[in-house]
Amino acid sequence: YGLKDFIYSYPTNLSGGMKQRVALIRTLATKPDLLLLDEPFSALDSQTRIIICNDVYKIVRKEKKAVVLVTHSIEEAIIFADKVIVLSNRPSKIKNIYDIKLEKNSNINERRESLEYTKYFNSIWKDLDLDE
């Protein structure tokens, strides 16, 4: 994940994205049954986000891990999750629940390119009331 050259660096010398990659690696290395991921890809650049998100997605599927993913990214929620829960503004309440039915054996790019992905994205966008 581009960290090899920084093996002897202090954490203060790492970028936010590097620290986030270290945190993800450390979490996955412990092989937990449940992953609690709070904005795990937010500090990553677009290309790195896609690569690491795809890697984590494959690991989670292969090892049958349960994941609770907190994200502000509709895209991440749809391509990564089996279920998306949309919350209202404060005080947070469940606004809608989506059972995501995309091909589980596909990679995240294939999931993103499906027609169903676009339908989910548009529905979730409407739930967020951001157009008003």
How would you name each of these model-derived features?
Residues L24:
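Hydrophobic anchor residue at the start of the ABC signature
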Residues K64-V70:
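Conserved H-loop
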Residues S9-T12, T30:
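Conserved signature/switch motifs of ABC ATPase nucleotide-binding domains
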Residues R49-E63:
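Helical segment within the ABC ATPase nucleotide-binding domain
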Residues L35-D38:
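Catalytic Walker B motif of ABC-type/P-loop ATPase nucleotide-binding domains
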Residues Y1-F6, K58:
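Conserved ABC ATPase "signature" region
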Residues I79-V86:
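Conserved catalytic segment of ABC-fold P-loop ATPases
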